[in-house]
Structure formats: C-alpha cells, structure tokens
C-alpha cells in the first residue's frame, strides 16, 4: 500500500500530504481515522507533513468537489474568516508543518473564483502568522493569471486529460503537459506539479462514447494483473509514454491505460526541462516499481 510506496521513495521525498479532510452534511470537518493515523505516523519522520483540505461532502448526500459548499464557506467575509480560522486551528492541533488546500471546481464561476482568490490571500497570511507552510493545489483549467498571492507553493495537477469523464487515453500527454506548463508561468513562484499514478479502464467504449459501459480508476498493480490474466501485451504510447492494452471477456471489450515508473519519469523530465523541480505524486499505493522514480 501507500506505506510500502513511501518506503521505496523515502530518500527522494521531502514532504507528504495526509489526504484528506472533507466536510460532513453540516459543513463541519470530517477527518477519517486513517488520516489521523497517517499524521501520527509521518510527523515523527524527517519530512514536512501537510494536512490536505478538500471541498468533498461525506454522508448521505455525498458530493465531490461541491461548489455549493464553497459558496457557504467563502460566500461572505464572516464565513470566509471562520473557514480560515478553522483550517489553521485544525492543522495546528494536529501538529503538522503545513496546510494543503485542495478545493476544486470553482474556476468556471467568476464570482466564486474571486472569492477563492481573496480566501487564499487571507489563508496565506494566517498560515504565516501560525508558522504553517501553505501549498495550494490547482486544476489545469484554472486561469493562473487571475492574481494569485505570492508566498504559497502552487501545485498544478498534470492529470485528468483522460479519465472517467472522457474516452480512453492517458491521464496526461506531452501536448497537455507543455500547454499547462506554459500557462503556469503566470503563477507566482514557487511552482510545482502533481502527477498521477495508475490509470483507468473503459468497458465497451463505442464510437464517440455512444455505447459505453463501466469506467473506473485502477492502480498500476491492478492493470498489470488484468494484462496477465487476459494474456494482453501492453504497448507504450509515444505521445504520453503511458501503457495501454485491450481485452475481451464475458462479451465485453475493455481498454486500459495506465502509468508505470517509465511514464512518470518521462513526465518528471518534461516538467524539469521547463524549470519545475518540485513534483508531487498522487497517490502512493498500488504501484509496482515506484522506487525507479527519478528525483532530479
């Protein structure tokens, strides 16, 4: 699992994010037990530990990347200040070194984007006052020239090019990475990127997706097991360095795309060639050869 991947990468890792704090149906923090355990385990090690905050809602009306929740948390100044205080207080109570802000799905709402920007300035100041580091995770679709604060580290997701929302393909490819890195130059330093392990499976993806079955994210280990089980030979795609294969079983055709360490190293090299030295890996667990990742 994640612990094994961390052990394999230990000498190349200088920070770890404990993912994730979300919200319950009353807009109160929901902290899973495994996050508490992870914080306790990693904060004793010689690396920076971040507590990650998302705008996911856990419970009966479960919702990921909930925009309505962000409006309630950031919509007026009193709510925003309360949100800042609560994030900083929780991070301080856990004894972590920093806050990782992973709010998503706000950029298309111009008014919410402006509220979010004000919020990041206030959160940045509060983190400085409380001796906490701040990392802000951003989707590649965010307008990076919108006026972000100097001070935090900005981590841009270099994935989700293909996934459950689309037809088959790699989570990232050269064109997507280079386009996003060019846009990122509008962000203040320090700039970093996040790369995704694993891949996705598409069942019965017909012409233009008119006929489509199950789509699910899978780990590298699961992808390798599927290829072995169905005697499929993965091929490496030139544009993305990702591996892909198809197989037929039980009357269904399935296409699988996934990343291995060679894929991730190609992406890391591309980012490094554009001046990005800091790379986050999402996520640890289910990888077969993660020790092969380059750190430079």
Predicted features and spans:
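Conserved, mostly hydrophobic/aromatic
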Residues: 16, 101, 154, 193, ...
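Extracellular low-complexity, Gly/Ser/Thr-rich intrinsically disordered linkers
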Residues: 246-295
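Active-site groove signature of glycoside hydrolases
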Residues: 82-114, 154-160
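A cross-domain feature marking catalytic cores of carbohydrate-active enzymes
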Residues: 20, 51-55, 103-105, 136-140, ...
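Glycan-recognition patch characteristic of GH18 chitinases/ENGases
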Residues: 1-81
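Short, acidic/polar
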Residues: 1-12, 76-92, 139-145, 259-272
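Substrate-binding surface in catalytic domains of secreted glycosidases
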Residues: 25-34, 108, 113-226
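Glycan-binding loop/region signatures in secreted carbohydrate-active enzymes
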Residues: 58-69, 197-267
């Amino acid at each position: 699992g994640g612990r094994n991947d961390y052990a394999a990468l230990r000498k190349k890792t200088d920070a770890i994010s404990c993912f994730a704090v979300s919200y319950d149906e009353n807009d109160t923090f929901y902290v899973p037990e495994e996050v508490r355990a992870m914080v306790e385990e990693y904060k004793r090690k010689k690396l920076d530990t971040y507590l990650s905050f998302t705008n996911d809602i856990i419970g009966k009306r479960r919702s990921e990347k909930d925009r309505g929740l962000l409006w309630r948390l950031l919509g007026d100044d009193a709510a925003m200040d309360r949100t800042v205080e609560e994030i900083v207080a929780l991070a301080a109570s856990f004894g972590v070194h920093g806050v990782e802000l992973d709010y998503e799905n706000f950029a298309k709402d111009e008014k919410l984007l402006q509220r979010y920007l004000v919020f990041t300035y206030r959160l940045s100041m509060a983190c400085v006052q409380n001796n906490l580091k701040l990392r802000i995770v951003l989707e590649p679709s965010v307008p990076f020239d919108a006026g972000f604060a100097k001070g935090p580290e900005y981590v841009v997701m270099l994935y989700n090019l293909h996934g459950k929302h689309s037809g088959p393909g790699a989570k990232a490819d050269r064109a997507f990475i280079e386009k996003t890195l060019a846009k990122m130059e509008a962000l203040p330093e320090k700039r970093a990127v996040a790369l995704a392990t694993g891949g996705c499976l598409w069942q019965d993806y017909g012409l233009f997706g008119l006929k489509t079955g199950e789509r699910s994210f899978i780990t590298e280990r699961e992808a390798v097991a599927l290829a072995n089980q169905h005697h499929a030979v993965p091929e490496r795609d030139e544009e993305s360095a990702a591996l892909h294969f198809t197989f037929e079983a039980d009357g269904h055709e399935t296409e699988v795309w996934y990343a291995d360490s060679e894929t991730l190293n190609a992406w890391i090299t591309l980012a490094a060639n554009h001046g990005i030295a800091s790379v986050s890996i999402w996520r640890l667990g289910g990888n077969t050869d993660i020790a092969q990742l380059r750190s430079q």
